[in-house]
Amino acid sequence: MGNTCCVAPATTDEVGAPPRDHHHAAKKSPAPSATTTTATRQRHGQEPKPKPKPRARAKPNPYDWAPPRVLPARGGAAASAVRVLEGVVPHHPRLRVTDKYQLGRELGRGEFGVTHLATDRATRERLACKSIPKRRLRTAVDVADVRREVAIMASLPDHPALVRLRAAYEDADAVHLVMELCDGGELFDRIVARGRYTERAAAAAARTVAEVVRACHAHGVMHRDLKPENFLYAGKAEDAQLKAIDFGLSVFFRPGERFREIVGSPYYMAPEVLRRDYGPEVDIWSAGVILYILLCGVPPFWAETEQGVARAILRGAADFDREPWPRISRAAKSLVRQMLDVDPRRRPTAQQVLDHPWLHHAARAPNVPLGDVVRARLKQFSLMNRLKKKAMRVIAEHLSVEEVEVIKDMFALMDTDNNGRVTLQELKDGLTKVGSKLAEPEMELLMEAADVDGNGYLDYGEFVAVTIHLQRLSNDNHLRTAFLFFDKDGSGYIDRAELADALADDSGHADDAVLDHILREVDTDKDGRISYEEFVAMMKSGTDWRKASRQYSRERFKTLSNSLIKDGSITMAR
């Protein structure tokens, strides 16, 4: 058994050196000397510490930390030898996470890790444990991301709206982060589940988001990825606290510092991020986008392609005329407009947002229902349209034997009664047999997404589509095959009749309302038919952004920014 380490972080001093953004605009600083460290403490009004004893390691200047240069192998001894938490948290030798916590059912999966229910063996307190296998940390960037996330979570204050990191462990195989359990569901899901949704409810949620930004900025942390999915309720009670849970893209910053790396989620990304010259004001913009969606149910900047979304963000012309904006108070609209100002210098600070009359008196915000249209929009916001589901099934049915060999074997294993279809229970039992630990809510979500005909079970095509749903649709041959399935006459377009034929139910009927919705959503040039380019844009929009890995997003957004520079949409800061 390799060495292990553990920490129960409480203050910044216990954490050690918080890592800097490894793609930061500034050059890396050399390792701090005793002189520079003392000078830094004096700038912050602290008394200089005495010179450390010989052979003792001096505490680094947090702003001069550079990410590790190690490039771990994909597995084996090289990956195990990487000390991810070295210099970030103090060591506690030979204590394993399972010594203190009993790990239970899976709660969810992320890019690097898996989160399980963790029960304190002594107190029986229920927490969440995110385990990050070292074999998944393939590059120095991956290692630096985890180090920075741990340092940031440990340095943030004990605030009711911030999930608390309770302990961090490291052994030869993985890093384990034990934190507060938030099992009350996502922000939007709770809104949809409520029978009545009002401006006052939106104000309450928006105030929590603003409090998170204020707490982060006060401690020198820029979040950089504020979005509804990163806010969970602590419990299922109606008055449960809403908490920010993900700091994977957050960075430490100093006043006046500028950043260049393009990160975040497209709908919530500030224009200056696309220009690669930004500071903490980006969090105010993202919070403003969340508030806009809370009030009307759709994002303020929308298009069917990534470049279209980016151009809409750069223009910054949000729509305040459509339903339900006419019935929303002037105070609410005033705050949203201020937060979505394209000039970051004119945006309010987090404290100014909280002091705005609409949020300062959030409990007295109008209690008039915003209408079912908002709840319906919020529900549809993250769902694929029916055409996209059908297209994924077509792709699945035309994959080569080599591409689906493993999936075919799994299908045969799960189809225990050999009737050519898999029920949800068979899916659960089969995944258990093959050692999968996919969380039950995720199984149900995939089942619902892939069950195109809604009959409660998956045939082979739908089953393979589950896998396609989780992959980036980058193979043009696959997309062309799916397009030709709909384009029966080979005209190069999918017309309304072909769309109706492809989406007809067993009786041969196609819902006109569904067809109208798909055409409105996909037919961007409004010529009454869907071109191949429009089809590809539909298939590559939305889902990719939520499922893409962090590294993939970095490269994708860099490419997007370069294309916007080339076509003159943005001008780089000098």
Curated annotation (Swiss-Prot):
Ca(2+) 3 binds at D487, D489, S491, Y493, E498. Expressed in leaf blades and stems. Expressed at low levels in anthers and spikelets. The keyword Protein biosynthesis does not apply. GO terms for molecular function: ATP binding; calcium ion binding; calcium-dependent protein serine/threonine kinase activity; calcium/calmodulin-dependent protein kinase activity; calmodulin binding; protein serine kinase activity. Coiled coil: none annotated. A lipid is attached at G2 (N-myristoyl glycine). GO terms for biological process: intracellular signal transduction; pollen maturation; positive regulation of response to water deprivation; response to osmotic stress. PROSITE patterns: EF_HAND_1, EF_HAND_2, PROTEIN_KINASE_ATP, PROTEIN_KINASE_DOM, PROTEIN_KINASE_ST. Ca(2+) 4 binds at D523, D525, D527, R529, E534. Ca(2+) 2 binds at D451, D453, N455, Y457, E462. Residues 365-395 are annotated as: Autoinhibitory domain. It is a lipid-anchor. Transmembrane segments: none annotated. Ca(2+) 1 binds at D415, D417, N419, R421, E426. It catalyses: L-seryl-[protein] + ATP = O-phospho-L-seryl-[protein] + ADP + H(+); L-threonyl-[protein] + ATP = O-phospho-L-threonyl-[protein] + ADP + H(+). The keyword Acyltransferase does not apply. Its EC number is 2.7.11.1. One of its GO terms (cellular component) is plasma membrane. The active site is at D225. Induction: By infection with the rice blast fungus (M.oryzae). Induced by abscisic acid (ABA), salt stress and osmotic shock. It is found in: Membrane. Activated by calcium. Autophosphorylation may play an important role in the regulation of the kinase activity. Its main location: membrane. May play a role in signal transduction pathways that involve calcium as a second messenger. Functions in signal transduction pathways that positively regulate responses to drought, osmotic, and dehydration stress. Regulates expression of stress-associated genes in response to drought. Involved in tolerance to drought stress by increasing proline and soluble sugars, and improving stomatal closure. Required for pollen maturation and spikelet fertility. This is Calcium-dependent protein kinase 9. The gene is CPK9.
